Amino acid sequence: YRAVDSADELRAACEELGYPAMLKARMGGYDGRGNVPVESKADAEDALDAVAGPAMVESFVDYAREVSVIAVKGATDEATGETDDDSVESGETEVATFPVGENVHREEILRETIVPTRSSETAQERAQEVALDVLDVMDGRGVYGIEFFETRDGEIQLNEIAPRPHNSGHWTIEGA
Protein backbone atom coordinates (compact mmCIF):
# COMPACT_ATOMS: atom_id res chain seq x y z
CA TYR A 1 0.00 0.00 0.00
CA ARG A 2 1.07 3.60 -0.47
CA ALA A 3 -0.10 7.00 0.74
CA VAL A 4 -1.07 9.24 -2.18
CA ASP A 5 -2.03 12.90 -2.41
CA SER A 6 -2.04 13.49 -6.17
CA ALA A 7 -3.01 11.78 -9.40
CA ASP A 8 0.68 11.46 -10.33
CA GLU A 9 1.43 9.73 -7.00
CA LEU A 10 -1.58 7.46 -7.52
CA ARG A 11 -0.47 6.46 -11.02
CA ALA A 12 3.11 5.79 -9.82
CA ALA A 13 1.88 3.69 -6.89
CA CYS A 14 -0.45 1.68 -9.14
CA GLU A 15 2.38 1.03 -11.60
CA GLU A 16 4.32 -0.45 -8.68
CA LEU A 17 1.42 -2.30 -7.03
CA GLY A 18 -0.36 -3.32 -10.23
CA TYR A 19 -3.83 -2.79 -11.60
CA PRO A 20 -6.53 -3.11 -10.50
CA ALA A 21 -5.93 -1.34 -7.19
CA MET A 22 -8.17 0.03 -4.45
CA LEU A 23 -8.05 3.68 -3.41
CA LYS A 24 -9.27 4.36 0.14
CA ALA A 25 -9.89 7.68 1.87
CA ARG A 26 -7.56 8.13 4.85
CA MET A 27 -10.28 9.84 6.86
CA GLY A 28 -14.04 9.52 6.93
CA GLY A 29 -14.33 6.22 5.09
CA TYR A 30 -17.03 3.94 6.44
CA ASP A 31 -18.78 0.81 5.25
CA GLY A 32 -17.24 0.95 1.77
CA ARG A 33 -17.74 4.69 1.39
CA GLY A 34 -14.50 6.35 0.40
CA ASN A 35 -13.30 3.22 -1.46
CA VAL A 36 -12.80 3.52 -5.21
CA PRO A 37 -11.42 0.85 -7.54
CA VAL A 38 -8.68 2.02 -9.89
CA GLU A 39 -8.65 -0.08 -13.06
CA SER A 40 -6.15 1.93 -15.13
CA LYS A 41 -4.03 5.11 -15.30
CA ALA A 42 -7.01 6.89 -16.82
CA ASP A 43 -8.98 6.45 -13.57
CA ALA A 44 -6.53 8.39 -11.36
CA GLU A 45 -8.09 11.88 -11.48
CA ASP A 46 -11.69 10.69 -11.04
CA ALA A 47 -10.73 8.28 -8.26
CA LEU A 48 -8.99 11.00 -6.25
CA ASP A 49 -11.92 13.36 -6.79
CA ALA A 50 -14.26 10.65 -5.49
CA VAL A 51 -12.38 10.18 -2.20
CA ALA A 52 -12.09 13.99 -1.81
CA GLY A 53 -8.89 14.08 0.21
CA PRO A 54 -5.74 12.24 1.18
CA ALA A 55 -5.87 8.55 0.39
CA MET A 56 -4.16 5.19 0.53
CA VAL A 57 -3.88 2.92 -2.47
CA GLU A 58 -3.43 -0.80 -2.05
CA SER A 59 -3.26 -3.89 -4.19
CA PHE A 60 -6.66 -5.26 -5.05
CA VAL A 61 -7.51 -8.43 -3.13
CA ASP A 62 -9.71 -10.93 -4.93
CA TYR A 63 -11.26 -12.35 -1.78
CA ALA A 64 -13.80 -15.08 -1.19
CA ARG A 65 -15.44 -13.35 1.77
CA GLU A 66 -14.99 -10.59 4.31
CA VAL A 67 -14.97 -11.70 7.92
CA SER A 68 -14.62 -9.79 11.16
CA VAL A 69 -13.85 -10.32 14.81
CA ILE A 70 -15.32 -8.11 17.51
CA ALA A 71 -12.62 -7.81 20.15
CA VAL A 72 -12.53 -6.04 23.50
CA LYS A 73 -9.53 -4.79 25.43
CA GLY A 74 -9.76 -3.65 29.03
CA ALA A 75 -7.36 -3.38 31.94
CA THR A 76 -7.18 -3.02 35.64
CA ASP A 77 -7.06 0.47 37.05
CA GLU A 78 -3.35 1.30 37.17
CA ALA A 79 -3.76 3.55 40.20
CA THR A 80 -5.85 1.23 42.37
CA GLY A 81 -5.27 -2.20 40.82
CA GLU A 82 -9.04 -2.74 40.89
CA THR A 83 -10.87 -4.74 38.25
CA ASP A 84 -14.40 -5.96 37.73
CA ASP A 85 -13.08 -9.49 37.21
CA ASP A 86 -11.49 -11.30 40.17
CA SER A 87 -9.59 -13.62 37.81
CA VAL A 88 -7.48 -10.72 36.46
CA GLU A 89 -4.37 -9.78 38.40
CA SER A 90 -3.47 -6.13 39.01
CA GLY A 91 -1.75 -4.59 35.99
CA GLU A 92 -2.82 -7.33 33.56
CA THR A 93 -4.74 -6.55 30.41
CA GLU A 94 -8.06 -8.26 29.88
CA VAL A 95 -9.04 -9.26 26.32
CA ALA A 96 -12.01 -11.06 24.83
CA THR A 97 -13.17 -11.90 21.32
CA PHE A 98 -16.49 -12.92 19.84
CA PRO A 99 -16.89 -15.64 17.19
CA VAL A 100 -15.81 -14.78 13.65
CA GLY A 101 -18.63 -13.29 11.58
CA GLU A 102 -19.00 -13.33 7.80
CA ASN A 103 -20.05 -9.98 6.36
CA VAL A 104 -22.41 -9.72 3.41
CA HIS A 105 -22.47 -6.36 1.61
CA ARG A 106 -24.89 -5.00 -0.97
CA GLU A 107 -24.11 -1.70 -2.69
CA GLU A 108 -21.04 -1.31 -0.45
CA ILE A 109 -23.15 -1.41 2.75
CA LEU A 110 -23.04 -4.21 5.31
CA ARG A 111 -26.47 -5.83 5.22
CA GLU A 112 -25.94 -9.09 7.07
CA THR A 113 -23.40 -10.78 9.34
CA ILE A 114 -23.49 -14.57 9.48
CA VAL A 115 -22.21 -16.03 12.76
CA PRO A 116 -20.44 -18.30 12.77
CA THR A 117 -18.86 -17.71 9.40
CA ARG A 118 -18.79 -20.41 6.76
CA SER A 119 -14.97 -20.16 6.77
CA SER A 120 -12.81 -23.16 7.56
CA GLU A 121 -11.85 -23.78 11.17
CA THR A 122 -8.24 -22.93 10.26
CA ALA A 123 -9.27 -19.56 8.78
CA GLN A 124 -11.42 -18.77 11.83
CA GLU A 125 -8.58 -19.62 14.20
CA ARG A 126 -6.18 -17.44 12.21
CA ALA A 127 -8.60 -14.49 12.28
CA GLN A 128 -8.93 -14.86 16.07
CA GLU A 129 -5.12 -15.04 16.45
CA VAL A 130 -4.57 -11.90 14.37
CA ALA A 131 -7.34 -10.08 16.27
CA LEU A 132 -5.56 -10.84 19.55
CA ASP A 133 -2.27 -9.65 18.01
CA VAL A 134 -3.98 -6.40 17.01
CA LEU A 135 -5.23 -5.88 20.58
CA ASP A 136 -1.71 -6.53 21.83
CA VAL A 137 -0.22 -3.67 19.80
CA MET A 138 -3.04 -1.14 20.24
CA ASP A 139 -2.69 1.32 23.11
CA GLY A 140 -6.39 2.05 23.41
CA ARG A 141 -8.95 0.22 25.47
CA GLY A 142 -12.46 -0.66 24.39
CA VAL A 143 -14.27 -2.41 21.57
CA TYR A 144 -12.62 -3.00 18.19
CA GLY A 145 -14.12 -4.27 14.96
CA ILE A 146 -11.30 -6.03 13.11
CA GLU A 147 -12.04 -6.86 9.47
CA PHE A 148 -10.26 -9.40 7.30
CA PHE A 149 -10.35 -10.62 3.74
CA GLU A 150 -10.37 -14.37 3.38
CA THR A 151 -8.76 -15.25 0.06
CA ARG A 152 -9.96 -18.11 -2.11
CA ASP A 153 -7.15 -20.31 -0.76
CA GLY A 154 -8.17 -19.63 2.87
CA GLU A 155 -5.51 -17.03 3.70
CA ILE A 156 -6.56 -14.32 6.16
CA GLN A 157 -5.49 -10.73 5.36
CA LEU A 158 -6.09 -7.81 7.72
CA ASN A 159 -8.30 -5.20 6.04
CA GLU A 160 -9.41 -2.67 8.64
CA ILE A 161 -9.25 -1.91 12.35
CA ALA A 162 -12.25 0.06 13.58
CA PRO A 163 -11.56 1.28 17.14
CA ARG A 164 -15.25 1.41 18.06
CA PRO A 165 -18.33 -0.76 18.30
CA HIS A 166 -18.61 -2.12 14.77
CA ASN A 167 -21.77 -2.80 12.80
CA SER A 168 -20.75 -6.43 12.24
CA GLY A 169 -21.18 -6.85 16.01
CA HIS A 170 -24.75 -5.55 16.13
CA TRP A 171 -26.21 -8.95 16.91
CA THR A 172 -29.72 -9.71 18.03
CA ILE A 173 -30.24 -11.24 21.46
CA GLU A 174 -31.06 -14.51 19.68
CA GLY A 175 -27.69 -14.43 17.93
CA ALA A 176 -25.54 -13.75 20.99
Pin down the residues of each PLM region.
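Phosphate-binding core of ATP-grasp and ATP-grasp-like enzymes
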Residues: 50-119, 124-158, 162-170
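Active-site lid/adjacent beta-loop-alpha segment flanking the redox-cofactor pocket in flavoenzymes
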Residues: 173
